């Protein structure tokens, strides 16, 4: 029985499992002719948790988490070159999600989160690396532009808007959002203007770094429900950012000079490197990036400390850009070939044209990002006229089309048949 009368005649309720009265426990929950206390509920939760962790141990350390080598191979399918950065990213992301899998386990060692800083020129693949990782792991992903952020209370985007976008990208599933990836681009553009802490208000520089710091190290972010604006007397969705992986990226123009100056100071005397400054490219110099260089550049020490994994990406050369045009799963040439195929035509880009495209992108200093605009410009007239043409078999792009704006060569079906017969 779960009900008894006390000596004073008062009706007492007892837990059906441990037998404690309603006065001995904090809470007694009633069911059909049974009662259970809060202490027994906690005990049941512990038993279920222990059973779940033992099942996980039997099944092995991971179920569907790719190893660093597998992650690196997946990145190879979409991103050309940048092998050192791929290895660093693969290990960091693997360790991060391995850490999340073991969060519920009781252990003396608490695994800290390692966020990532990607340093590399425009168009070197920073954003693509982060996007590919998120897609591979099937986790919510958002790209934020650091230049649009301001401190709370000023005109511009609040840093918590980043978490709001992440939540929107996973249909407001809080649990999924708390294990997502946030990529913050142009992080170098919010550097403070001098080495010394600012005495005036810097709402889009050091102030934003301070606001981002709380988000990156882990805080409870208050997000308006369903994308509304913040206003008083409103219920907020609480998101814990502790387990969100933050990847920050930037070109860091001028960082190579800071590194060179540090290297020259430390390399005086017989131990000095005889390699002249001209012999090393900016990309090679930036491979030696140290935390002190980033602080001198304008990132606050606390933020540098929260981004312990630094991966440097090299500037892409002509050979790498040609590979990007041809080799990845979603290579640009494959994309434009597919577009022309829908109109019944084949696309042929001659080797000299590929070299011309790569050289033009290098001259513009836009890296891989500039390849699409060059190809788009070369094929614009063809894509405009082709839907009205009935008989085009092949579109040929040569060096003259890229360098001098000459019209692409159109080969018609009759010509193709004649050349085939010969």
Curated annotation (Swiss-Prot):
SMART domains tied to this protein: AAA, ClpB_D2-small, zf-C4_ClpX
Q: Which residues bind ATP?
A: 121-128
Q: Write the record's keywords in alphabetical order, separated by commas.
A: ATP-binding, Chaperone, Metal-binding, Nucleotide-binding, Zinc
| Binding of Zn(2+), residues | 15, 18, 37, 40
Which GO molecular function annotation, any one, does this entry have?
Answer: protein dimerization activity
Name the InterPro entries for this protein. Answer: AAA+_ATPase, ATP-dep_Clp_protease_ClpX, ATPase_AAA_core, Clp_ATPase_C, Clp_protease_ATP-bd_su_ClpX, ClpX_bact, P-loop_NTPase, Znf_CppX_C4
Q: Which GO terms describe its biological process?
A: cell division; proteolysis involved in protein catabolic process
Query: Does the keyword Nucleotide-binding belong to this entry?
Result: yes
Q: Name one Pfam family in it.
A: AAA_2
Give all residue intervals belonging to the ClpX-type ZB domain.
2-56
Q: Name one GO cellular component term.
A: HslUV protease complex
| Known partners and oligomeric status | Component of the ClpX-ClpP complex. Forms a hexameric ring that, in the presence of ATP, binds to fourteen ClpP subunits assembled into a disk-like structure with a central cavity, resembling the structure of eukaryotic proteasomes.
Q: Which family does it belong to?
A: Belongs to the ClpX chaperone family.
Biological function: ATP-dependent specificity component of the Clp protease. It directs the protease to specific substrates. Can perform chaperone functions in the absence of ClpP.
Q: What is this protein called?
A: ATP-dependent Clp protease ATP-binding subunit ClpX
Give the species this sequence originates from. Janthinobacterium sp. (strain Marseille)
């Amino acid at each position: 029985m779960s009900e008894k009368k006390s000596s004073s005649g008062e009706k007492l309720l007892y837990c059906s499992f441990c037998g404690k009265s309603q006065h001995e426990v904090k809470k007694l929950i009633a069911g059909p002719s049974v009662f259970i206390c809060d202490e027994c509920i906690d005990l049941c939760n512990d038993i279920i948790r222990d059973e779940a962790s033992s099942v996980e141990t039997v099944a092995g350390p991971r179920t569907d988490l790719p190893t660093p080598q597998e992650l690196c191979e997946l990145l190879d399918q979409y991103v050309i070159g940048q092998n050192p950065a791929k290895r660093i990213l693969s290990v960091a992301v693997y360790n991060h999600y391995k850490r999340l899998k073991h969060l519920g386990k009781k252990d003396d060692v608490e695994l800290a989160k390692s966020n990532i800083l990607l340093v590399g020129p425009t168009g070197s693949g920073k954003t693509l690396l982060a996007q590919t990782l998120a897609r591979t792991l099937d986790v919510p992903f958002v790209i934020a532009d650091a230049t649009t952020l301001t401190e709370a209370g000023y005109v511009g985007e609040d840093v918590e808007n980043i978490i709001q976008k992440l939540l929107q990208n996973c249909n407001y599933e809080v649990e999924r959002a708390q294990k997502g990836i946030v990529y913050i681009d142009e992080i170098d553009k919010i550097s403070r203007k001098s080495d010394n802490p600012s005495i005036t208000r810097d709402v889009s520089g050091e102030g934003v770094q301070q606001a981002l710091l709380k988000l990156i190290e882990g805080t409870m972010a208050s997000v308006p429900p369903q994308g509304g604006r913040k206003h008083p007397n409103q219920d907020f969705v609480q998101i814990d950012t502790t387990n969100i992986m933050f990847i920050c990226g930037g070109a860091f123009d001028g960082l190579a000079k800071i590194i060179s100056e540090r290297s020259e100071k430390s390399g005086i005397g017989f131990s000095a490197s005889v390699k002249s400054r001209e012999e090393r490219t900016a990309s090679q110099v930036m491979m030696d990036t140290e935390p002190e260089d980033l602080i001198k550049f304008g990132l606050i020490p606390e933020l540098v400390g929260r981004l312990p994994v630094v991966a440097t990406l090299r500037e892409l050369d002509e050979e790498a850009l040609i590979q990007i045009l041809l080799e990845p799963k979603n290579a640009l040439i494959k994309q434009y070939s597919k577009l022309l195929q829908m109109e019944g035509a084949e696309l042929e880009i001659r080797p000299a044209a590929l070299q011309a495209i790569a050289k033009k992108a290098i001259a513009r200093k836009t890296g891989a990002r500039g390849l699409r605009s060059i190809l788009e410009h070369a094929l614009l007239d063809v894509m405009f006229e082709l839907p009205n043409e009935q008989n085009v078999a092949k579109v040929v792009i040569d060096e003259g089309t890229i360098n001098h704006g000459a019209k692409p060569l159109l080969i018609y079906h009759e010509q193709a048949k004649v050349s085939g017969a010969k």
